[in-house]
């Protein structure tokens, strides 16, 4: 809603379903959590490799987690807590202090819905204030996340390839690549970035399907693909690659400056 306030919202049960819908319909945009400041990568890399959708933008969203329960419930009554694995990990100190049993579910909002429908006062969910309002739940404890500066990076993605014209803004270029199988391939492939003074903000490996000897790499760099130094660096990288694919060029979110 922050990004597309007038858009029709289509809920999906899984990340794979989100990617699949966008892959089948050019008019659909998906907003996918990619990484978290506390717990790191969310785990959608394999879907980025699988579908190769275009990235249009990034959005950083501050995260606050709340313990939600049925109206009239007290924290001392709670034995089981339900939420997405990331929310549970990000609230681990509170969970441990309260001696709660963790139960992993597909998402935070779905966990709140489960609590609302199951009508068991020994159960609670970790979710947002909006979920509490939607499902008529009490907020038993507010801001239970381990770190108060918690934030999640989201990617806005879709099927059509769209790229901003190079201007004065700060940009991120995102791409994936697979190296040729030879000694020191990764070391040699990254030399062009060092020589041309290009900063890599992310470099992550992921095993190719059914293999632990062949890897794809997911990379973000500071800059626009049309900048000469970026082009030279990527040309150098290409000499060492079996596969190379640009995922997107987009303005760097101002949150990065904080």
Model-found features: residue ranges?
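Domain-level signature for soluble enzymes in the chorismate/prephenate branch of the shikimate pathway
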Residues: 1-258
